[in-house]
Amino acid sequence: MRRTIADLISDRYYGTLDSLCLDAGLDFTAQAIGNALNIVGDNIQAKGRVQKPQGEFWAYQTEGSYDIKEASSAAHLYGKRVASAEAFTDAKFSHSLADLKNLADYALAFGSNEFVVCASAYQPWTDKIPGNTGGGRHYCLNRNNTYWNYSCPFWDYQARCAGLLRKGIPVVDLCVYLGDNPPVKLLSYRLPEMSEGYNFDVCTTDALINRTKALDGDIVLPDGMKYRMLVLQKDCEMTLAALRHIAALVKQGVPLYGDRPAYPVSLAERMHDNEYDKMVTALWGTGKKESGVHSLGKGHVYWGMTLEEALRKEEIRPDIILKSGNEPEDRMYFTHRHLPDVDIYFVNNHSKNVFSDSIHLRTDRRYA
């Protein structure tokens, strides 16, 4: 039932609105379904039903927001050029443009390439400064802010970055499958420990089955984008159809990382327990070893080890090698776009510390 509800929200609500907007010659962007877990939906599928999937980041989210990672993932998976983001929400007058730039940079590094600024344009008074018409929220991005008349270079920078990050094809090594147990969204505690130097997208069953195929050991999308490895989130619950598709990918050489599922996610599929168990055994082998590697066709399945170990065994080199600080907040984020004659890397030093180090890029292009 929950899967049916999620499909209806994606197709009949967001899909219908998207069709109506297309017929009327309008763009349609939506924060589908947003951060809430109280809606029985599929965030990636729903975002894939709109012309411009949108996430959001708030000024207090200094360590990043995975909502924008969902939006950029949906844009990549469903072949959409723009991954939008509600930007700088609740930024206060005490925030400087330097503070806002660091927020913008991590959003760009998470895959956003359009900012819809959260601000209140309605400010009719000329004698009330700084003035606030945001219903209790701080909306500092208006003409009464002391830096407003000097902020053009800040906005020009955002426009240039967004323009560059719409060019070419995204380069993302890892596709993390979130399973099929609505509500489905990216939850950080269910992600494996992500190895530095590798970027990732997240997908759900609709995109996995209907948009991906295997080619030369990679997961390939219709527009030519590819992933090097399929990764299962922790305690990943999946349908028999998803399991079949994953097995087909592995047989054709796609490496898989993650633990074996215990049983079908849907009660309706319990009548197919025998086939489900056979598929699990084909992928993970007999017995229940805590860690191991199992071969199926041309591909390998890894579990019980770190993701970094599995990537090393598959000889998938980091896309970028750079220095991060010793503190959790001293992170480096990046995104990468591939063009016929050049690679575009955008790197965000997401800290207030200055690092001096060499950066190694995985590219054979003359220009990067």
Predicted ranges, named:
Residues 1-368:
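Carbohydrate-binding surfaces of carbohydrate-active enzymes
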